[in-house]
């Protein structure tokens, strides 16, 4: 059905106790140059991944609402991905399936919506302005369209600063999962003014 402007999916409120599960510690130590060959190689290794999936904890905190959910993210091809949000009880709150030119979202009532812009759809239906188009790169440890960023001492992203559509996002990476090759982000925090988005990845499967 067409995407309405007024409908909001009501996710369960965020319990105060879960905030620590998504805490982010800024990496210490000197950073590396974005022009380094090691950083270029790391980016290329990540971009060469054809398929990947991760699951973990999601928190959104603002003056208007606090939301906690479990998430599952699966990329099956270029611009083909699936995002699933479940509440702490394990029930599905929303499922989003995207492919070039078409995005479908099913809410917690089983209602189906279609659009050509996943980021706009998520924002209208949940009230959370998640920068999904950029997050698809950031969650992999890639800067996307951002040109203002810093690396850690292992030639991986540690911070991103990015402005678009009136939003000024700062992304801080708290660590990487070195059990995968290439190493993938283990947790991250996005902030824009009074809004915070926290992601903690439990594990990665990459191909």
Swiss-Prot record:
- Lipid-linked residues (N-palmitoyl cysteine): 22
The record's annotation in InterPro entries points to:
LolA/LolB/LppX (IPR029046), OM_lipoprot_LolB (IPR004565)
Q: Give all cystine bridges in this chain.
A: none
Q: So which domain of life are we looking at?
A: Bacteria
What NCBIfam families does the entry give?
Answer: lolB (TIGR00548)
Checking HAMAP family in the record gives: LolB (MF_00233)
Name under which the protein is recorded: Outer-membrane lipoprotein LolB
Species this protein is from: Escherichia coli O7:K1 (strain IAI39 / ExPEC)
């Amino acid at each position: 059905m067409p995407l309405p402007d007024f409908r909001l999916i009501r996710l369960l409120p965020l319990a105060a106790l879960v905030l620590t599960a998504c805490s982010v510690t800024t990496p210490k130590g000197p950073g590396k140059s974005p022009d380094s060959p090691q950083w270029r190689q790391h980016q290329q290794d990540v971009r060469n991944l054809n398929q990947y999936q991760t699951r973990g904890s999601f928190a959104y905190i603002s003056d208007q609402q606090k939301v906690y959910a479990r998430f599952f993210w699966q990329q099956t091809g270029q611009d083909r991905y699936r995002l699933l949000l479940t509440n702490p009880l394990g029930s599905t709150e929303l499922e989003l399936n995207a492919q070039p030119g078409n995005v479908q979202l099913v809410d917690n009532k089983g209602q189906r919506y279609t659009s050509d812009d996943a980021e706009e759809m998520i924002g209208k239906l949940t009230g959370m302005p998640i920068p999904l188009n950029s997050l698809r790169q950031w969650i992999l440890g890639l800067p996307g369209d951002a040109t203002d960023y810093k690396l850690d001492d292992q030639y991986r992203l540690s911070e991103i600063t990015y402005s678009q559509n009136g939003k000024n996002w700062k992304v801080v990476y708290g660590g990487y999962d070195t059990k995968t090759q290439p190493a993938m982000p283990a947790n991250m925090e996005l902030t824009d003014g009074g809004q915070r988005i926290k992601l903690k990845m439990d594990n990665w499967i990459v191909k």
